Each structure stands twice: as structure tokens, then as C-alpha cells.
Amino acid sequence: MLCLPVFIILLLLASPAAPKSLETRIQNDLIRAGLTDADLKTEKGFLSGLLNVADSVCCKVDTSCCSN
């Protein structure tokens, strides 16, 4: 009778350690890839926005730096 609680505890400890299914791993990879793509797109948009602001400030101060 003492073996039953030990067996149950071992089952509880072993179940979270079970490997993830392939489908779950693929979903995690796709989510991570999507976040990476989103970061890159945001960064490019952010950098181009900064360049536009810097260009407009430069044009207001000195017209020789304007690209137009």
C-alpha cells in the first residue's frame, strides 16, 4: 500500500517532463519567427522616420544639406 503514493508522486513528476509534441514546437517556432519579423519591420520604419525628421530639421537650418 505504501507503493501507491510513491507511484502517484512519480507520475506527477514525470508528466511535466514529457517532451513537447512536434505541433507545439512548430507553433512556438512560428510565433518566434513572426515576432522577429515584426521587430525588423518596426525597426526599419523607426529608422526611416528618424532619418526623415533629421532631414527636415537639417533643411530648416541649412538648405545645403537638403536632398531636394
From Swiss-Prot:
Query: Where would one find coiled-coil regions in this protein?
Result: none
Instruction: Enumerate the subcellular locations listed in this protein's record, separating them with semicolons.
Output: Secreted
Residues of the propeptide region, as annotated, are 20-54
Q: Does the keyword Glycoprotein apply?
A: no
Residues of the signal sequence?
1-19
Q: Which InterPro entries match?
A: T-conotoxin
Which protein are we looking at?
A: Conotoxin Lt5.11
Query: What is the predominant subcellular site recorded for this chain?
Result: secreted
Tell whether Isomerase is among the UniProt keywords.
Answer: no
GO terms under cellular component: extracellular region
Q: Which Pfam families match?
A: Chi-conotoxin
Protein family per UniProt = Belongs to the conotoxin T superfamily.
Organs and tissues of expression: Expressed by the venom duct.
Keyword list (alphabetical) reads: Disulfide bond, Secreted, Signal, Toxin
Q: Spell out the post-translational modification annotation for this entry.
A: Contains 2 disulfide bonds that can be either 'C1-C3, C2-C4' or 'C1-C4, C2-C3', since these disulfide connectivities have been observed for conotoxins with cysteine framework V (for examples, see AC P0DQQ7 and AC P81755).
Q: Domain comment text?
A: The cysteine framework is V (CC-CC).
Which terms in the Gene Ontology molecular function aspect does this entry carry? toxin activity
* Biological classification of the source: Eukaryota, Metazoa, Spiralia, Lophotrochozoa, Mollusca
